[in-house]
């Protein structure tokens, strides 16, 4: 509701600590809060290699990015890129894609039947860890270069520009034409509310910003819903590549 003072309405909480993203909505019933805390426990605890005594969260690997959801979404907030070339990419990942080379692939992309053309060996997302005895697909390294920017009023600011490198490929050399897309883990707050926004409201907002000739504009993204097999409005992820929370979660587990 544009007139709502609180962005989250009755779900909002009045906590401003580092734990504020990790609290249940204030209007949850007691039973729903119980569901929240069970889910939150799974979110924080690491998955382990099967077989294991903790069979409710075994099955890690063989390749993976991190062992726990919380490792990427620290305190349910935004992640960060590695600070140095030696740092692990704990809350950061690399998406992969190849150029479309056939008429079928080009048509599938045009019709939103596929998000991208995945790499034939490494798939659509690089996994930089493996269980014991399984080589990781590669190591993600970053180098930062200072870049000076001068604003219109003469103010000078120094920004950092990253260069990402994929080293130690575990399953064959990378193709020269392979495209990479660095992604920082997104915050978890408000995703349930985002799922409740009607499609028409999102479309209307995109049209409104584009017609305003402003510096900020957007367009809605059509993607294939794997549950229905139909093209639907994307909502989740940096590029709105998932239609529902359940498919976003499934993608993160895959």
Regions found by a protein language model. Name each.
Residues 10, 14-36, 44-254:
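Extracytoplasmic redox metalloprotein regions
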Residues 39:
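Basic, ligand-binding patches in group-transfer machinery
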């Amino acid at each position: 509701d544009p007139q709502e003072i609180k962005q989250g309405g009755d779900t909002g909480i009045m906590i401003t600590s580092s734990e504020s993203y990790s609290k249940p909505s204030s209007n949850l019933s007691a039973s729903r809060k119980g569901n929240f805390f069970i889910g939150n426990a799974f979110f924080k605890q690491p998955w382990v290699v099967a077989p294991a005594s903790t069979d409710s969260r075994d099955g890690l690997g063989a390749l993976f990015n991190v062992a726990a959801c919380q490792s990427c979404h620290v305190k349910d907030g935004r992640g960060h890129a590695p600070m140095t070339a030696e740092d692990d990419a704990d809350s950061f990942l690399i998406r992969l894609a190849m150029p479309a080379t056939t008429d079928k692939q080009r048509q599938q992309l045009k019709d939103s039947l596929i998000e991208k053309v995945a790499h034939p060996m490494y798939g659509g997302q690089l996994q930089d860890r493996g269980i014991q005895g399984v080589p990781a697909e590669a190591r993600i390294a970053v180098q930062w270069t200072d870049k000076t920017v001068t604003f219109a009023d003469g103010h000078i600011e120094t920004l950092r520009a990253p260069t990402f490198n994929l080293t130690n490929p575990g399953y064959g050399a990378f193709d020269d034409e392979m495209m990479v897309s660095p992604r920082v883990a997104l915050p978890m707050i408000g995703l349930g509310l985002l799922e409740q926004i009607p499609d028409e409201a999102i479309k209307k907002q995109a049209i409104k910003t584009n017609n305003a000739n402003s510096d900020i504009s957007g367009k809605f993204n059509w993607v294939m819903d794997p549950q229905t097999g139909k093209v639907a409005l994307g909502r989740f992820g940096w590029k709105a590549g998932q239609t529902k929370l359940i498919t976003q979660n499934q993608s993160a587990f895959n």
